[in-house]
A protein has these predicted regions:
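Alpha-helix-loop-beta-strand connector modules within alpha/beta enzyme cores
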Residues: 9-36, 74-100, 137-154
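Catalytic cores of alpha/beta
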Residues: 38-53, 88-120
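Glycine-rich phosphate-binding active-site loops on the catalytic face of alpha/beta enzymes
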Residues: 1-7, 55-71, 108-139
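Conserved anion-binding
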Residues: 1-76
Length: 154
């Protein structure tokens, strides 16, 4: 958790870390997160540069900075708006899959795919829960949101 500690990465730093990581680990699948603090045009350019440097996947972020004004579903959309916008913009310029992460929920996961993401990251939506049953329920809910399927009731 770099942001709570005040640690901000600029584009040049992310690019250099990517190059060094790729040089050390040439055969691993490398996913790199584009910092949401960059202006959108810089996020797009960084994504292109990261692919040139060897990134196999580009991940967006942004939900940690969003402060929703509304309750309910609208608040969930407001929270996810920065990462959804980044996924839309970056997927338009990226030659590799884009993963949309940060602040996603069952309401916004389908929006991420519609925005151009190839996949989603929902770690904190699950990891913040203390109960394994609740974790399973959240994962199932997210899967249903992605597939649009609802299990048959007996």
């Amino acid at each position: 958790a770099f942001y709570p500690q005040g640690r901000i990465f600029d584009a040049a730093e992310v690019l250099e870390l990517t190059r060094r990581t790729r040089a050390l680990l040439p055969d691993v699948v490398l996913s790199v997160t584009v910092p949401h603090v960059l202006p959108m045009d810089e996020q797009e350019q960084l994504a292109v540069d990261l692919v040139d440097a060897g990134a196999d996947l580009i991940q967006t972020e942004g939900g940690t900075s969003a402060r929703p004004f509304s309750a309910g579903s609208l608040g969930l959309i407001e929270k996810a708006a920065p990462t959804l916008a980044a996924a839309h913009s970056i997927s338009g310029v990226s030659e590799v899959p884009v993963l949309c992460a940060s602040g996603l929920s069952a309401v916004t996961v389908p929006m991420a795919i519609a925005a151009g993401a190839s996949g989603v990251g929902v770690g904190s939506a699950v990891n913040r829960l203390d109960d394994e049953l609740a974790m399973v329920a959240v994962v199932r809910g997210l899967r249903e949101a992605l597939t649009g399927s609802v299990p048959a009731r007996v």
